[in-house]
C-alpha cells in the first residue's frame, strides 16, 4: 500500500472519527509506518453501508461491526472528542485526556436516524442486538412506511420488499424524482421501475408533517402519518425514517468557527487541508466538497490526506483531490441494483453482482485484516 518512511519522534497523527474515512486513513498511515492514534466513540467500526440489510436479515448485523482494537491495537482509543486546541495542538477527550498531534485528520462523518446510522455510544454486541430487534419489528408489521426517497430510502424500501414480499411497503418522498439528485435521469428512472415492480407504493412530492410525533422502528398498529397535501393520511404498522442526515461537527466547530460551511462541514483546499491549517485535514462527510456523501469517496479522501501527511514529512509534492464524474451504486435488495461509475450507466446485473450480494462487507473485513463471521 505504501513504503515506510522514517519520521521524527514528534510526529503523531490523530484521526478523529472511525468511519470509512477514519479507518482508511489509519490503514494507510499504518502502511507508511507513521505513528497515529484513531479516536472513536464506539468500540467497533460500523459498516453502515450495509445497515439496511442488517435491518431485514437476521444474523447479518454481526457482519457489519468490526472491532477497532483487533486491527489497530494500541493505536485505537475509545472516547468522545469534545474539543481541539489548535494553539497547543491537542485533541481533548470527554475523559479530560489530551492527545498531542503534529498532524490532524478530521473524519467525523455525519449523523442520521437509525437504522442508517448508530448514534448512541453502545458496545458492538449491543449494537448488533439493536438491529436484531429491528428485524423482529419489521417481521411483525403488515404495512411498513419508509419516509425519505433519497438513496437510503429507496434502498430501505427495496430491502424490506425483497425479504418480505407479502408486506405492504409505502415510500413517501418530498420530491418527484427518487434517489440522489446528481444521478443520471436513467438511473433514477430505473430505481422507480424496480420499486414499482416489487410492489412498493410510491407517494411522491409529499411531506410527512407529524414525523416528530411518531415512534419509528417499533411496530405499532394504526400509526397515522399526516401528509402535507389534500389532508391525506397513511395508516401503517411501522415507520422507518431515512431523512435528516447532518454533518457531525460538534467536536471541531468551536476550533474552526470561521472555516465552516453552512452545513457544518470544514472548508478544505485541493490538498484536503482545512483552510489556513497546513497540518489539519478533513475527509469524508465532514469535508466541504461538491459531491455526494458516500463511503467510496470518503476512502479516497482519506488515502489522499494520509499520503499528503507522508509527503509533507519527506518533502514531496502534495496530491490534489478534485471531484470527478459521479460514481454511485444502489443496492435494491440482494437481487437487484442500478448505478453509475465515472458518469457511465451501470446495468442491474452488474450492480447486483458488484454490490447487492454482500454490500461490500467482506471487503471491509479484509481491509481491517480480520475474518468475517459466517
UniProtKB/Swiss-Prot annotation:
It is a lipid-anchor. Binds 6-hydroxy-FAD non-covalently. 6-hydroxy-FAD binds at residues 17-21, 53, 81, 285. GO terms for biological process: apoptotic process; vitamin K metabolic process. It catalyses: ubiquinone-10 + NADH + H(+) = ubiquinol-10 + NAD(+); phylloquinone + NADH + H(+) = phylloquinol + NAD(+); menaquinone-4 + NADH + H(+) = menaquinol-4 + NAD(+); menadione + NADH + H(+) = menadiol + NAD(+). Its cofactor is 6-hydroxy-FAD. Keywords: Acetylation, Apoptosis, Cell membrane, Cytoplasm, FAD, Flavoprotein, Lipid droplet, Lipoprotein, Membrane, Mitochondrion, Myristate, Nucleus, Oxidoreductase, Transmembrane, Transmembrane helix, Ubl conjugation. Its EC number is 1.6.5.-. It is found in: Lipid droplet; Cell membrane; Cytoplasm; Mitochondrion membrane. The chain crosses the membrane at residues 13-35. Its main location: other. The modification by 4-hydroxy-2-nonenal (HNE) adduction in mitochondria results in loss of the oxidoreductase activity and activation of a novel function in mitochondrial oxidative stress signaling. InterPro entries: FAD/NAD-bd_sf (IPR036188), FAD/NAD-binding_dom (IPR023753). The modification N6-acetyllysine is found at residue 167. N-myristoylation at Gly-2 mediates the recruitment to lipid droplets and plasma membrane. The keyword Cell membrane applies. GO terms for molecular function: oxidoreductase activity, acting on NAD(P)H, quinone or similar compound as acceptor. A lipid is attached at residue 2 (N-myristoyl glycine). The record marks 173 as: 4-hydroxy-2-nonenal adduction. Pfam families: Pyr_redox_2. GO terms for cellular component: lipid droplet; mitochondrial membrane; nucleus; plasma membrane. SUPFAM superfamilies: FAD/NAD(P)-binding domain. Belongs to the FAD-dependent oxidoreductase family. A NAD(P)H-dependent oxidoreductase that acts as a key inhibitor of ferroptosis. At the plasma membrane, catalyzes reduction of coenzyme Q/ubiquinone-10 to ubiquinol-10, a lipophilic radical-trapping antioxidant that prevents lipid oxidative damage and consequently ferroptosis. Acts in parallel to GPX4 to suppress phospholipid peroxidation and ferroptosis. This anti-ferroptotic function is independent of cellular glutathione levels. This is Ferroptosis suppressor protein 1. It comes from Xenopus tropicalis (Western clawed frog). The gene is aifm2.
Amino acid at each position: 500500500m505504501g513504503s515506510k518512511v522514517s519520521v521524527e519522534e514528534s510526529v503523531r497523527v490523530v484521526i478523529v472519527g472511525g468511519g470509512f474515512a477514519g479507518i482508511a486513513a489509519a490503514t494507510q498511515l499504518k502502511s507508511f509506518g507513521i505513528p497515529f492514534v484513531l479516536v472513536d466513540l464506539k468500540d467497533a467500526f460500523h459498516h453502515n453501508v450495509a445497515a439496511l440489510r442488517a435491518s431485514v436479515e437476521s444474523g447479518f448485523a454481526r457482519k457489519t461491526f468490526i472491532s477497532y482494537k483487533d486491527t489497530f491495537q494500541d493505536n485505537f482509543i475509545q472516547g468522545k472528542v469534545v474539543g481541539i486546541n489548535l494553539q497547543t495542538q491537542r485533541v481533548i477527550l470527554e475523559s479530560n485526556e489530551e492527545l498531542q498531534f503534529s498532524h490532524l485528520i478530521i473524519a467525523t462523518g455525519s449523523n442520521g436516524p437509525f437504522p442508517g446510522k448508530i448514534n448512541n455510544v453502545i458496545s458492538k454486541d449491543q449494537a448488533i442486538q439493536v438491529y436484531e430487534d429491528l428485524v423482529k419489528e419489521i417481521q411483525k408489521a403488515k404495512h411498513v412506511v419508509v419516509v425519505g426517497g433519497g438513496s437510503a430510502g429507496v434502498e430501505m424500501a427495496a430491502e424490506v420488499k425483497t425479504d418480505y414480499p407479502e408486506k405492504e411497503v409505502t415510500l413517501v418522498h418530498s420530491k418527484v424524482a427518487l434517489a440522489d439528485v446528481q444521478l443520471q435521469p436513467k438511473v433514477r428512472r430505473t430505481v422507480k421501475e424496480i420499486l414499482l415492480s416489487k410492489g412498493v407504493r410510491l407517494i411522491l412530492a409529499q411531506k410527512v408533517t407529524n414525523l416528530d410525533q411518531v415512534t419509528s422502528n417499533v411496530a405499532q398498529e394504526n400509526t397515522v402519518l399526516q401528509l402535507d397535501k389534500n389532508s391525506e393520511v397513511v395508516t401503517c404498522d411501522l415507520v422507518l425514517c431515512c431523512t435528516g442526515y447532518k454533518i457531525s461537527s460538534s467536536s471541531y466547530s468551536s476550533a474552526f468557527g470561521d472555516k465552516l460551511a453552512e452545513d457544518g462541514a470544514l472548508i478544505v483546499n485541493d490538498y484536503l487541508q482545512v483552510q489556513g491549517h497546513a497540518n489539519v485535514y478533513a475527509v469524508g462527510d465532514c469535508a466541504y466538497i461538491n459531491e455526494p456523501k458516500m463511503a467510496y469517496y470518503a476512502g479516497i479522501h482519506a488515502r489522499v490526506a494520509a499520503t499528503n501527511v507522508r509527503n509533507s514529512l519527506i518533502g514531496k509534492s502534495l496530491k490534489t483531490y478534485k471531484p470527478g464524474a459521479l460514481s454511485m451504486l444502489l443496492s435494491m435488495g440482494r437481487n437487484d441494483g442500478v448505478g453509475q461509475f465515472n458518469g457511465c450507466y451501470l446495468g442491474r446485473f452488474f450492480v447486483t453482482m458488484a454490490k447487492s450480494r454482500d454490500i461490500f462487507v467482506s471487503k471491509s473485513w479484509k481491509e481491517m485484516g480480520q475474518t468475517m463471521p459466517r
